[in-house]
């Protein structure tokens, strides 16, 4: 089945984006205070469903896009948009989220704590890829955590696709699945050539998984499956291709209820709550 990519005919034409050496997309889906300074570019995800809502920046329904897949692909619709619509003059591309950014907490205002263009310029001299710190699951593996939180068939289908179409990535995948740490959040900054390669590989894998996986009975949260799976693929791609990276801290615009989050984690592991 051919994958659908659409071009939004209803959006007004935009002037060519003013591109610096770096563009970091800020994925958002509702009105929120956003950074409107270089190198940050707010992008409204799932915009095809909200023709009357414009949040500033760009929309993932413009140009070549998969905006209609946002309920299942989450912020990856922004990633796809960037791969196919950002001019190649953007020599590095990143992805963040309206509630989380790379930065160091120094003030009471998170948007003042995010890294500046000059910070990123220095980071990219040090490494072609910048990531957040790894998540450590401590009491279970990356695979068991996913299975307790979502559906086993997601991982099994992904494993089958890698085995059949990208077998060179299977050793790194199995090593990651049996380990307890991985980079999640779908946050990174990459040199453009690596960004293009990663996106092409990632969507080739996920589109094939989508063809094979029946999610018709999934809850709204579990239906975000391809966004969740992508978080378990970034390290697989990096490790297989021996690509170096550095890690930088994350600042949040909203507080996390760690007690609730931790309780849910334990209950899922015990099979009491999905």
Model region roles, listed by residue range:
Residues 1-6:
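Short, small-residue-biased leader/transition segments that mark boundaries at the very start
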Residues 17-274:
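ER/Golgi luminal nucleotide-sugar-dependent glycosyltransferases, focusing on the catalytic module
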